[in-house]
Amino acid sequence: NEADVDALAERFFAEYNLKCKEQKESAPETADDYLDLAEQVTSKKKSVEYLHKALELEPDNLDARLQLILRTAEQPDERRLALQELLDAADKQMEKSGAFKEYAGEFWTAFETRPYMRVRYTYFDVLISCGMMRRAIDEGQRLLELCENDNLGVRYQLMHLYAYMEDEMHALALHKQFDSYEETQMLSLIHI
């Protein structure tokens, strides 16, 4: 009956509102909580503050360090240098944990190595922004070694870089590796 449905809906909304209030009142406890808060706020200053709090809890948190660089390093060269430093530290973390051996070729499928891949991909992107195409190509190739399925779509940017550098041999090898139509569109540019 209609009264029962109304009563049920009223009870649902009361419980839902109570849960929402409890969640708002609960203080962040983990670095991930602070990372979430940093993503949600619109103020750059507040976001940076939350990222610093995340790093107080987990100084080696790659996602927090990456986001801090993206929010504070304004110029591409400044970002590149900061990312290079972070990548060096991240490489040491991965080496120490044995991730390079354990997850070889499958870095994106392992939850533990995704922050590393985000750092590496961002570095790749910044190299392109800085016009450092040869270094970007090396980085793109490294990303494909770490994640053979290319879950990040690196092959598309890499194909553009090969075309830009007129590197037909590597472009054809990349096309053969992924054997898909999308990359063939760029192959014609190499012959121009």
Where on the chain are the PLM-derived regions?
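Internal, conserved structured core segments that host functional sites
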Residues: 120-156
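Short coil turns that delineate tetratricopeptide repeat
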Residues: 59, 148-149, 182-183
